[in-house]
């Protein structure tokens, strides 16, 4: 049981040495000196060092001892209770002590980029609502608009961003004909979507009815017309046909 623990401990030691060497924490000269120390130790497991096994089914046992807690320098890890530690592993407990004074650097954290906020008057942005024809700024009267309502010298002049252009470039007008901006203006303000207009044909028909009272009266249903029609069908001796006729 002790030999198995020693073998596992040696394997961990070699793995740790390889990791330290690969990470650049120890030099190749230091690595060679440690390996030479392990090879020169008469109690080392040569089968593990050379990758060969001198026994057919068993590993060569190594010397092991129980480590006295007082022998371990302060600040180094202590072995667990009743845990046999190999002499080689105990000799390597001081490995990396020269690095113990280095300050541990916290992992670098990546801050999320803040979303662009509305520019202030310090940037001399002219109000896009005031600048765009046919629009008025609702916040200017309340004194809440952060933009200039004047042609400030050196101010950024851009109209509102076209709603349809911002929505996947769906504007049917060219950049020259559209009164809104077909580019990401610095103020980042997009024009609202136009409201649906009522049909001109519907408005014109209603206006025509109002201008012709007789025509409007004819379009309205009068119950007296039904009574007159019933009298005509009775005089002809036939019933009035159904509505689906």
Curated annotation (Swiss-Prot):
GO terms for molecular function: zinc ion binding. Gene3D superfamilies: Zinc finger, CCCH-type (4.10.1000.10). InterPro entries: Znf_CCCH. Residues 209-226 have a biased composition (Basic and acidic residues). Residues 186-245 are annotated as: Disordered. Keywords: Metal-binding, Repeat, Zinc, Zinc-finger. A zinc finger (C3H1-type) spans 121-152, 161-185. Part of the gene cluster that mediates the biosynthesis of the brasilane terpene glycosides brasilane D and E. The biosynthesis starts with the activity of the terpene cyclase braA that converts farnesyl pyrophosphate into the sesquiterpene alcohol trichobrasilenol. Subsequently, trichobrasilenol is glycosylated by the O-glycosyltransferase braB putatively using UDP-GlcNAc as sugar donor to yield brasilane A. The latter then undergoes two rounds of oxidation performed by the cytochrome P450 monooxygenase braC. This is Brasilane terpene glycosides biosynthesis cluster protein D.
